[in-house]
């Protein structure tokens, strides 16, 4: 082992550890330059460069040359406002840790990132605890990314282009100001871990049920009142965190119900009574309308609906240990009671109607995984 000042180089592990030494960019620059040509071989063999918790305000220029095989760079806990073009010279970099800095805005990442070799090499990127208000577009071109962490920023939304990251296995977006989840998030076939906690999310798109590899889903501390019934398709899900959400126990009884239009009533009659028709009998718009019918999920009903329906929360057993509030759409208010009664395996509808809302909620919430 060779020690130069307080920095430690471990020859066997090809690692330079300069953590928590309160060094500035200038000091680091001087040290790297001082190593010079006599230690060129050691620099070229370096695989890991650890610089967290110092006083760096920019990346040292020396990174732009002499580190061709560097695989891990940790610059977390500094005062970086931008990652300069020196980063693009690290052609084999696999892991970049730059959390808890001051990164944000369009100039935070180097120009040409999406066209650089990093697009093919970088697998782990941690930018949590910075000042990003939106996901930088260049990040969405890093096709080799397996782990992306952007927690604790100021993100307002998730771009639809997130689906470009087809190799992504872990996505951490907790602690932001996200209100909506784009349906395109469901197009990530390799995603195992999805963290969306501590945001302002009000609903979950049913397309998330396409994440067939998902094992852990963190949704705690949001504004969710229900989950889509399609979430039951996540058969590999092992962890589900829902604490801190206003998940409802009963649907609001006095929810305004708008009666069906005459067009919908006529279309319902055609569907329910199996009245035959051909493409030559009706205009194209009516044919398309009739084709948009949805079946009422109440097994005792057998009806259909088009634009007008009644929403109802139904608690459903999931994986044998969770009771999840899922949204159902019924064709009329008359379908509410039978369907609701069938959905409660441990508490009858009459009991639920007679109990105080708060006490029902408290007991039900104990049956939902709280994380």
UniProtKB/Swiss-Prot annotation:
SMART domains: LRR_TYP. Residues 340-361 are annotated as: Disordered. PROSITE patterns: LRR. LRR repeats lie at residues 45-66, 69-91, 92-113, 121-143, 144-166, 167-189, 190-211, 213-234, 236-256. One of its GO terms (biological process) is intracellular signal transduction. The modification Phosphoserine is found at residue 24. The keyword Cytoplasm does not apply. SUPFAM superfamilies: L domain-like. Residues 340-351 have a biased composition (Low complexity). Keywords: Leucine-rich repeat, Phosphoprotein, Repeat. This is Leucine-rich repeat-containing protein 58.
């Amino acid at each position: 082992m060779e020690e130069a000042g307080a920095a430690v180089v471990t020859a066997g592990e090809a690692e330079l550890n300069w953590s928590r030494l309160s060094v500035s960019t200038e000091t680091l620059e001087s040290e790297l330059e001082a190593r010079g040509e006599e230690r060129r071989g050691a620099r070229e063999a370096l695989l890991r460069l650890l610089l967290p918790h110092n006083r760096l305000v920019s990346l040292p220029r020396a990174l732009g040359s002499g580190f061709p095989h560097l695989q891990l760079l940790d610059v977390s806990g500094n005062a970086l406002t931008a990652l300069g073009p020196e980063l693009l010279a690290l052609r084999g970099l696999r892991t970049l840790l730059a959390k808890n800095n001051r990164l944000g805005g369009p100039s935070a990442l180097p120009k040409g990132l999406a066209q650089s070799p990093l697009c093919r090499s970088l697998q782990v990127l941690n930018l949590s605890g910075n000042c990003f208000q939106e996901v930088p577009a260049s990040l969405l071109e890093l096709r080799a990314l397996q782990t992306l962490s952007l927690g604790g920023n100021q993100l307002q939304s998730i771009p639809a282009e997130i689906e470009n990251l087809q190799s992504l296995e872990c996505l951490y977006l907790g602690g932001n100001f996200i209100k909506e989840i784009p349906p395109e998030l469901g197009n990530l076939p390799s995603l195992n871990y999805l963290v969306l906690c501590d945001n302002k999310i009000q609903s979950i798109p049913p397309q998330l049920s396409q994440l067939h590899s998902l094992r852990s889903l963190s949704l705690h501390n949001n504004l969710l009142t229900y989950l889509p019934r399609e979430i039951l398709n996540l058969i590999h899900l092992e962890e589900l965190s829902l604490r801190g959400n206003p998940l409802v126990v009963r649907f609001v009884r006095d929810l305004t119900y708008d009666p069906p239009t005459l067009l919908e009533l006529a279309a319902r009659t055609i569907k329910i009574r199996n009245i035959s028709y051909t493409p030559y009998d009706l205009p194209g718009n009516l044919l398309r309308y009739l084709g948009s019918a949805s079946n009422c999920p109440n097994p005792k009903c057998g009806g259909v609906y088009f634009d007008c329906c009644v929403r109802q929360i139904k608690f459903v057993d999931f994986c044998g240990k969770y009771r999840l509030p899922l949204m159902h759409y019924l064709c009329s208010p008359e379908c509410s009671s039978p369907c609701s009664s069938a959905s409660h395996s441990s508490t009858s509808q009459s009991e639920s109607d007679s109990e105080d809302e708060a006490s029902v909620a408290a007991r039900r919430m104990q049956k939902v995984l709280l994380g």
